[in-house]
């Protein structure tokens, strides 16, 4: 099994992994044979790529870091703005990753325009927890970090859908609106007694840069909470898997 871009998809290819929407329903089933119509439909919904099975990759098995079931639960929780369910999923992500002794990162998830934010948030949670494991954080802290990673973009759900799904560059005014999402996310979470202050600060500060060029507060260096630094790096790294737009951000992290 191997991952290909949607532009490389050809009729007759066999789908290697099922493709889900944000509700957890299957859009394209495992082992379905691609047709021109199906490929066209995938392009229409903004699918960047997919896994296929062929002779070149018949002996390759792609193991996900977290189960499809857990990924679907995370997406559903975020779609429904079910914070309690999201916290449970964040804890489960930490448990699954803690049990995974062989940390070979496979973060290629098949995303459409409508579910990009949700699947991106899952990947940021995974990358953040892996980073936390690498620097020796204890499990209770990892769970708080996982929650911050999973919820870091929850403020975007207050923004217009056409802004979130815009394919081209944002205008100055649109970018100004987009930058409000970290504050909106914090406002949504700040009164929730089930969410730690560490998690809330991770969400609030995840676009701060060590040189002071970030937002919303323009903090520098050690003024930025550790969770936010980890999430920012995970955020940019995951974006780079799907778009070059994040490359400029990486130089400022």
How should each PLM-predicted stretch be described?
Residues 149, 189-192, 196-228:
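Histidine/acidic-rich helix-loop-helix segments that form or flank divalent-metal centers
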Residues 242-253:
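Single conserved hydrophobic/aromatic residue that forms the stacking wall/gate
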Residues 229-241:
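Conserved beta-strand-loop-short alpha-helix elements that form
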Residues 53-179, 184-198:
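Acidic/His-rich, divalent-metal-binding segments that scaffold phosphate/diphosphate chemistry
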Residues 1-88:
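Membrane-cytosol interface segments
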Residues 29, 173, 240:
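Thr-Gly-centered strand-to-loop micro-motif
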């Amino acid at each position: 099994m191997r991952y290909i871009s949607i532009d490389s998809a050809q009729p007759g290819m066999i789908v290697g992994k099922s493709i889900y929407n944000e509700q957890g329903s299957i859009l394209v089933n495992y082992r379905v044979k691609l047709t021109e119509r199906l490929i066209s439909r995938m392009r229409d919904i903004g699918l960047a790529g997919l896994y296929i099975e062929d002779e070149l990759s018949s002996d390759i098995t792609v193991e996900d870091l977290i189960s499809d079931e857990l990924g679907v639960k995370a997406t559903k929780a975020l779609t429904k703005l079910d914070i309690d369910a999201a916290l449970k999923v964040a804890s489960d992500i930490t448990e699954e990753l803690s049990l995974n002794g062989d940390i070979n990162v496979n973060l290629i998830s098949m995303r459409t325009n409508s579910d990009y934010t949700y699947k991106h948030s899952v990947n940021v949670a995974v990358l953040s927890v892996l980073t936390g494991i690498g620097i020796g954080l204890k499990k209770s802290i990892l769970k708080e970090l996982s929650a911050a990673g999973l919820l870091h973009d929850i403020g975007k759900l207050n923004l217009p859908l056409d802004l979130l799904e815009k394919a081209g560059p944002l205008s100055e005014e649109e970018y100004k609106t987009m930058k409000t999402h970290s504050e909106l996310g914090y406002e949504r979470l700040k009164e929730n007694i089930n969410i730690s202050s560490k998690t809330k600060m991770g969400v609030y500060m995840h676009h701060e840069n060590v040189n002071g060029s970030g937002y919303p507060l323009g903090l520098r260096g050690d003024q930025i909470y550790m969770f936010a630094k980890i999430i920012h790096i995970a955020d940019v790294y995951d974006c780079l898997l799907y778009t070059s737009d994040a490359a400029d951000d990486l130089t400022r992290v």
